[in-house]
């Protein structure tokens, strides 16, 4: 039922920034809707939300192009932060492994 509502909501996403579609007020529908947007963007669509709601930016519109660049910059920043965190966690884990191997080795002696 919620997926159907999310799908209906998804189908209303407009072209251009003039009348963006706000997020659904229902949390479950909102989650399903955002998953649909994510899947669509992964599969060749271009849907953005820079705060006022969702829309498909139009190439001939300067505002849309500016907001797309803003959106893509934020996505790149998020991706870099995730990569940095991932690397830090991996290094921390390997350090713990080294300490445990050293500690276990010295305890056995």
Residue ranges and their predicted role:
Residues 41-52:
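A short, conserved structural fragment
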Residues 62-87:
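Short, amphipathic alpha-helical interaction segments positioned at domain boundaries
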Residues 28-42:
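Short amphipathic alpha-helical interaction segments
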Residues 1-11:
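Short alpha-helical segments that sit at the start of domains
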Residues 85-109:
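Exposed, interaction-prone assembly regions rather than primary DNA-binding/catalytic cores
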Residues 16-27:
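Short acidic, hydrophobic short linear motifs in intrinsically disordered regions
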Residues 52-59:
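Minor-groove-contacting beta-hairpin "wing" of winged helix-turn-helix DNA-binding domains
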């Amino acid at each position: 039922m919620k997926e159907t509502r999310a799908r209906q909501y998804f189908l209303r996403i407009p072209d251009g920034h003039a009348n963006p579609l706000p997020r659904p007020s229902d949390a479950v529908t909102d989650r399903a809707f955002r998953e649909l947007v994510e899947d669509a963007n992964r599969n060749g669509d271009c849907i953005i939300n820079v705060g006022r709601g969702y829309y498909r930016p139009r190439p001939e519109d300067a505002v849309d192009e500016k907001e797309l660049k803003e959106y893509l910059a934020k996505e790149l920043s998020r991706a870099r932060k995730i990569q940095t965190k991932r690397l830090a966690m991996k290094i921390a884990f390997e350090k713990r492994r080294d300490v445990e191997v050293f500690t276990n080795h010295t305890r056995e002696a």
